[in-house]
Design a protein with these regions (language model features):
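A short alpha-helical cap/connector motif
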Residues: 1-130, 134-159, 163-189
Length: 189
């Protein structure tokens, strides 16, 4: 019992500290978030707020590939507001449980271009796409080649966790390794 109280107290103190350090609306939402699990690097949120703020309160379509614990879908709903159409895509059918009003979870693989084309025709033009899926660069490349053309002219395409392009063990990556997403999008592009 004592350990449970201590753990909750430490978690609460961390949340207060994060709220105190928060500079943006998105960082504040993340700092006070108590819903489903969200697994994103903290430094993303200040950058996201800088680029996403102009979409808040608007009728937009957001697609996040990789639902995982469902927490980021909750954050996006709060951040963008009730007019936003939020879609999550995951290969795990259990992720359907994270659906809520205005937020749909679609089940399928980002490595399947036919499925991605069907998804794009179903949801329409995309304002913001966040690829937080498998992190395998083959999947990242398939997703980019298939869905980038469905991003609105003033839309954003974000591919998270590009560090996976450098991980030889889990992702067959490496520095300057041909075929990785980083090399595809590299400085010469």
């Amino acid at each position: 019992m004592h350990l449970g109280i201590r753990s909750r107290t430490l978690k609460g103190l961390r949340r207060v500290g994060a709220l105190f350090r928060a500079k943006t609306k998105l960082e504040r939402l993340v700092a006070v978030h108590t819903g489903h699990l969200m697994n994103k690097w903290n430094h993303y949120f200040e950058i996201y707020d800088r680029h996403f703020a102009c979409f808040c309160g608007r009728d937009i379509t957001l697609l996040e590939i990789g639902v995982s614990g469902g927490g980021s879908l909750e954050i996006w709903r709060k951040y963008f507001g009730p007019k936003a159409r939020i879609f999550g895509l995951d290969i795990n059918p259990d992720c359907k449980r994270f659906e809520s009003p205005g937020t749909r979870v679609l089940i399928g693989s980002q490595s399947d271009p036919k499925f991605l084309e069907q998804l794009a025709s179903e949801i329409g033009p995309i304002d913001i796409l966040i690829d937080d899926g498998s992190h395998a660069f083959n999947d990242q490349l398939i997703t980019f080649h298939t869905l980038f053309k469905h991003i609105r002219v003033d839309g954003l395409y974000v591919c998270e966790d590009l560090c996976s392009s450098y991980w030889p063990k889990d992702f067959d990556g490496g520095v300057r390794k041909t075929g990785t997403y980083v090399e595809f999008q590299g400085p010469d592009r």
